[in-house]
Amino acid sequence: KTHEKKIVSLAGRILSLRKMGKASFFHLQDSMGKIQIFIKKDDVGESEYENFQLLDIGDFVGIEGDVFKTKVGEISVKVKSMTILCKSIRPLPIVKEKEDEVYDAFTSKEMRYRNRHLDLIVNPQVRETFFKRTKIISSIRYFLDNLGFLEVETPVLQPIYGGANARPFTTYHNALDQQFYLRIADELYLKRLIVGGIDRVYEISKDFRNEGMDRNHNPEFTMLEFYWAYADYEDNMELVEKMIRSVSKQVDSEKINWDGNEIDLTKKFKRIPFFKLLNEKLGEDISQLDINKLKKLCIANNLSIKKNENYGQ
């Protein structure tokens, strides 16, 4: 709107087309959004308009023209010149729009997961997730850096894995003639830095666990670990609460919906001892139960257990 009546140059992918004789409309999209484009044969010439008639959804073009507002109030660009930048060899899923309603959208989960690039093109809410994730990571770094934490990088290939109870991925180092493991956690190396005198450290890194996978668990995942000398668990709880509140504010998500419930992240987090909460929910003092009674309790609450599970597990 601030560019109305100004000449602008734009480039992007054609996302929709409405060809109508001597004048046509199309939507041009880049990573930041989309805008309506108006092209008229009398403005660009017969040759250039004939080239436009050959375009399809998915093609990339560059245009130069005047910004204006249509009768219905939509900001658009009237083309003075157009350049074809790249031809799309394969057709895109066509998302149709009419009177603010969307139909024939690319919504099949199976197709979306197998074609994530198409999902990003035609579903803007998916693309927004990528931008929001990057902003979350940046906000976490900003928060910890301002508290004096030092971001570090620890080895991904480790001769001895540890820091968690998980099965590792294994690989072989030919030069050293030795088996190595992809890290399952950063803990041990970060603690060495604490021992070495760096009192506040953190790492946001890829970790790998060679175990089952579902929509909530992936063998390759990103994890934040931080360690803080001279601080106890109360200090850490306070820090995590402040960090979540700070990050949620930065990404405009102070109130979120989870499983049908609204969660207000601006409010003080409830704190309750773990065993106290379990005892309240189960109606028993689990610290007084032997291993057999604990197993029966797990089965009664639909928790799968193995025959050799011990008390700690």
Predicted regions and their residues:
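Class II aminoacyl-tRNA synthetase catalytic cores and aaRS-like
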Residues: K1-Q313
